[in-house]
């Protein structure tokens, strides 16, 4: 099958990290050298009690994956804010200090894809999904891709390897849907040869011909810490013939039995790494949501127990099916509600509720509301996660604020318009029009939360901080967004209930919304 081959920057070699949207990234930069202009050691450490090499290691990781614009040009305050965000993704306490827990978590195997895309200082059109992160031969709301394994590892039986690959592709094809949303059909077939395949899968060591050398078993030393690259994947928009291909480091010891990996073992769990890499091959970027398959850090979860998160699903739907009301509302909760929580504590027109949860902590520092699991992701099994979710649903009351667009809160309307203009690349006129929907949604959400019969779930609070890189970026899809606006306008002209009608976002709407949203 012919592959699409526009100009595009290489996807970062992936050592694996994973909500809603997809753009290709450049290859990882080399670790930043130490200079005399770097932050003073006492400012970097902040009381964390770790050595200089550990601090430089964490700073290098933060710059490499997009949390810092440049470690030579960050003020102590900027560094601490970026570090707290990095700690949130690492699932350790957001102390703002480089401590042992942060160093340990940052040393775990992960994907080399960038986590955070730094915004341009001026409005320039970024590469769109259709150019860099979407298969060009997708037809309508369906895409058919062929895969082939050209070079196997000797660690796993070949037949068993093919079975795992089939299951991993089936995971994406069977779960990439949301009730009452447009159906995107993903079809995967095994090709008869490498030349016929869209996605070529192989194992290799060291320099293997694609400019992204593997680092060998257990990785390489960075400072006094190891950085370990397990695999890398190329986005659909990368130059042929590598676009869509997935490579694994054959110097590692690969395993398909989940009982053989984990604490005290250097074996790498192939099924989960592969499932994550397929997301990149489909054009999905990383998500900061720990529950998402596209979160950048590996988990040892059996493939038959992996559940795609709402971020993963919306990434596929938006990429191949176009703009979606539901996914836009998810974006709204991430981009508008989260932004409000990062800048407002007790503003007029804001409703809030407190948390009585026993197995999560809340931290407030420098104006940012931070929400964190007490235990690291590496120790959380799938069964633990299910039990925790059910327990949290019973005990949760929430701890986030909901902004409201009102006559005495014009700043919230202005924020919404700015987000829509820059984030969705809408014109000022379209942004003002869509802001009506935004404000109606927020008003309805506020009323729904204050309803005495309301029983919120853990997922509502989690999503306030769960901005996935995939769903958070809508560039290149503004035409589809404008279609949603026009559709809402036509509904209003026909006197039909729609998002431009404040009564549209009622209890029934939010009950249905969160029924799917909290899965």
From Swiss-Prot:
Disulfide bonds: none annotated. SUPFAM superfamilies: Metalloproteases ('zincins'), catalytic domain, PGBD-like. Residues 27-126 form a propeptide. The lineage of its organism: Eukaryota, Metazoa, Ecdysozoa, Nematoda, Chromadorea. Metalloprotease involved in molting, a process during larval stages in which a new cuticle is formed and the old cuticle is shed. Plays a role in thermotolerance probably by preventing the accumulation of oxidized lipoproteins and cholesterol. It comes from Caenorhabditis elegans. Its EC number is 3.4.24.-. The active site is at 277. This is Matrix metalloproteinase-B. Glycans are attached at residues 341, 408. Inhibited by human TIMP1 and TIMP2 and the broad MMP inhibitors BB94 (Batimastat) and CT543. Residues 29-50, 391-410 are annotated as: Disordered. It comes from the Eukaryota. Residues 29-39 have a biased composition (Polar residues). The gene is zmp-2. PROSITE patterns: ZINC_PROTEASE. Residues 1-26 form the signal peptide. Keywords: Cleavage on pair of basic residues, Extracellular matrix, Glycoprotein, Hydrolase, Metal-binding, Metalloprotease, Protease, Secreted, Signal, Zinc, Zymogen. It is found in: Secreted, Extracellular space, Extracellular matrix. It is an enzyme of class 3 (hydrolase). Expressed in spermatheca and spermathecal-uterine valve, weakly in vulva and anal muscles and in two cells in the head (probably RMEV and RMED motor neurons).
């Amino acid at each position: 099958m012919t592959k699409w081959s526009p100009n595009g920057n290489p996807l970062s070699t992936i050592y694996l990290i994973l909500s809603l949207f997809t753009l290709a990234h450049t290859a990882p930069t080399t670790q930043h050298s130490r200079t005399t202009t770097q932050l003073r050691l006492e400012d970097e450490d902040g009381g964390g009690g770790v050595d200089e090499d550990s601090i430089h290691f964490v700073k290098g990781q933060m710059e490499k994956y997009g949390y810092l614009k440049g470690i030579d040009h960050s003020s102590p305050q900027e560094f601490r804010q970026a570090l707290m965000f990095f700690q949130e993704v690492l699932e350790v306490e957001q102390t703002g200090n480089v401590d042992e827990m942060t160093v340990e978590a940052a040393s775990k195997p992960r994907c080399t894809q960038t986590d955070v895309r730094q915004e341009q200082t001026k409005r320039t059109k970024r590469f769109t999904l259709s150019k860099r992160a979407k298969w060009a031969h997708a037809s309508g709301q369906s895409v058919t891709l062929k895969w082939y394994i050209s070079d196997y590892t000797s660690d796993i039986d070949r037949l068993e390897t093919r079975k795992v690959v089939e299951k991993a592709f089936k995971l994406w094809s069977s779960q990439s849907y949301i009730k009452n949303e447009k159906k995107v059909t993903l079809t995967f077939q095994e090709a008869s040869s490498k030349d016929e395949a869209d996605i070529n899968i192989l194992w290799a060591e060291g320099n293997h011909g694609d400019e992204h050398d593997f680092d060998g078993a257990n990785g390489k030393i960075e400072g006094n810490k190891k950085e370990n690259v397990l695999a890398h994947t190329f986005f659909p928009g990368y130059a042929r013939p590598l676009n869509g291909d997935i490579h694994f480091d054959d110097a590692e010891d690969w395993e398909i039995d989940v009982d053989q990996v984990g604490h005290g073992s250097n074996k790498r769990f192939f099924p989960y790494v592969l499932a994550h890499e397929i997301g990149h091959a489909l054009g999905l970027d990383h998500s900061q949501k720990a529950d998402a398959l596209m979160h950048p850090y590996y988990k040892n979860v059996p493939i038959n127990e992996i559940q795609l998160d709402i971020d993963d699903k919306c990434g596929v739907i938006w990429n191949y099916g176009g703009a979606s009301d539901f996914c836009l509302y998810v974006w709204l909760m991430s981009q508008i509600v989260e932004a409000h929580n990062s800048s407002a504590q007790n503003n007029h027109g804001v409703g809030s509720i407190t948390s009585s949860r026993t197995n999560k902590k809340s931290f407030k520092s420098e104006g940012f509301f931070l929400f964190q699991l007490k235990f690291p992701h590496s120790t959380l099994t799938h069964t633990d996660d299910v039990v925790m979710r059910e327990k949290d649903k019973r005990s949760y009351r929430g701890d986030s604020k909901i902004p409201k667009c009102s006559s005495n809160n014009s700043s919230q309307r202005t924020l919404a318009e700015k987000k829509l203009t820059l984030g969705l690349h809408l014109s000022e006129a379209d942004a003002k029009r869509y802001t009506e929907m935004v404000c109606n949604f927020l008003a309805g959400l506020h009323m729904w939360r204050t309803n005495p019969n309301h029983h919120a779930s853990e997922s509502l609070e989690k999503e306030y901080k769960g901005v996935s890189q995939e769903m958070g970026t809508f560039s290149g899809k503004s035409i589809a967004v404008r279609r949603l606006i026009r559709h809402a306008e036509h509904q209003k002209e026909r006197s039909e209930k729609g998002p431009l009608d404040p009564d549209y976002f009622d209890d029934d709407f939010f009950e249905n919304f969160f029924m799917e949203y909290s899965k």
